[in-house]
Each structure stands twice: as C-alpha cells, then as structure tokens.
C-alpha cells in the first residue's frame, strides 16, 4: 500500500515541479528581448543544475534500490534540461566578465558531479554506502540553495514591497516542498525528506513575510533585480520570485 501511495505522491510532486521548472521562462524571454542579462544572477540556476544532476543519478538503480525513486530520476532529468537551457541563454547574452564567471562555475559543478558518478560507480561497491554517499552530495547541493529565498525576504523587508515575491509562487513553493517531503517520509529517505523539510519551512516564512508586507502601501524602492533569488529544491529545482518557478 505504501509504495503505491508514495508513487502517487511522487507523481503529484513531479507535476508541481514541471510548473516550477517552467516558471523562469518569463525571465529569459525578457533577457532575449532586451539582449541583456542586466543585473540578473545565474548562480541559482547553476546550483539548481547541480541538484538536478545529483538527484537524477540518485534515482538510478545504480544508486537507489531498483526504480524506487523513478519519479525523482525522471523529474530531475527534466530539470537538467530546463536549467541547462537557462544557463546557455544567460551565457549567450552575458557580458564577457559574467560569461567567464558562469562558465567557470558551471564547469566546476559538472566536474564535481562527474567525480561523484565515477567514485560512486567504481570505488564504492556496497550499494547502501553508495546511496548514502550520493544522497549526501545531493543533500549538500540542495541546502546550499536555500540562501536565495532569504535574499528575497530580505529585499521585501527592506523595501516593504512584495513585488518580487508573488503570493502564488510562495504558496506553490510550499506545496511542492511539502509534497516531496511526504514522498521522502513515506519512503523513509532522509536525503529527500530533509532538504524539502527545510524548503517547507522557508515557504512558510515567505508566506508570513508576504502577509505582513502585502498590506504596506509604501512605494517600493529601486532595487537590483532578484527574480532568480527564490530557489526551491524538489527534490530539486528552483523558482524565481517575480511572477513568472524539481
């Protein structure tokens, strides 16, 4: 019974992730239209790519037991496609300095991922230890992304404007994190449940901040764009914070 429930929860989480993955499309339509990345940061997308790569590998039978995490593998693989596309667009329109920085960071996370795959495949022969190792890498990569929602909340508090943290995105981020946390709890998988537990807490905090500052009538101050500041790992992915978001 529990495997069936877990699979259904995984499907629900995957659908939520697909919507979140596609959300930055609006941001990059703006980048393409203006032929400039302006003040946008690519770091959240690079971190999201690392998480998606790691959890794609984590879901494979080589790491997990059989296809117990098939939904994780599938949706994370889709996330790799989305994040890779966003990063490519960013690099194409970025000035030389930012272009080099992004390519260096992307190369670094790809190198770490390749080393993770190689080490877990050829140096670790115990299946359980292999799963713990890859899951730990995924856990670290996921937690590293949670500074971004804090940046968004800081901007809301500073400017007293929720313009860059839309309600429906914060709500949907919470829903997605709760779904994948339930998936991890049902399967007794701490490497999926833990990061999404943190994501759920961040989602609740965002909603609290939104409720407090949505009533403020003060005109927002001029800010640098933080659309990409609100990132969520599901079991990993990210979400932008400007109405445009595994």
Swiss-Prot record:
Glycosites: 69
Compartments reported by the entry: Cell membrane
Key word Cell membrane present: yes
Membrane topology: Multi-pass membrane protein
A GO molecular function held by the record: sugar transmembrane transporter activity
Ranges that cross the membrane: 7-27, 43-63, 75-95, 102-122, 132-152, 167-187, 192-212
Keywords linked to the UniProt accession: Cell membrane, Glycoprotein, Membrane, Repeat, Sugar transport, Transmembrane, Transmembrane helix, Transport
InterPro entries assigned: SWEET, SWEET_rpt
Chain ranges of the MtN3/slv domain: 7-96, 133-217
A GO term from the CC aspect: plasma membrane
Cytoplasmic side: 28-42, 96-101, 153-166, 213-246
Extracellular face residues: 1-6, 64-74, 123-131, 188-191
GO biological process: carbohydrate transport
Subunit structure of this chain's protein: Forms homooligomers and/or heterooligomers.
Biological function: Mediates both low-affinity uptake and efflux of sugar across the plasma membrane.
Classification via PANTHER family: BIDIRECTIONAL SUGAR TRANSPORTER SWEET3A, RAG1-ACTIVATING PROTEIN 1
Family statement drawn from the similarity comment of this UniProt entry: Belongs to the SWEET sugar transporter family.
Name of the protein: Bidirectional sugar transporter SWEET3a
Organism of derivation: Oryza sativa subsp. japonica (Rice)
Lineage: Eukaryota, Viridiplantae, Streptophyta, Embryophyta, Tracheophyta
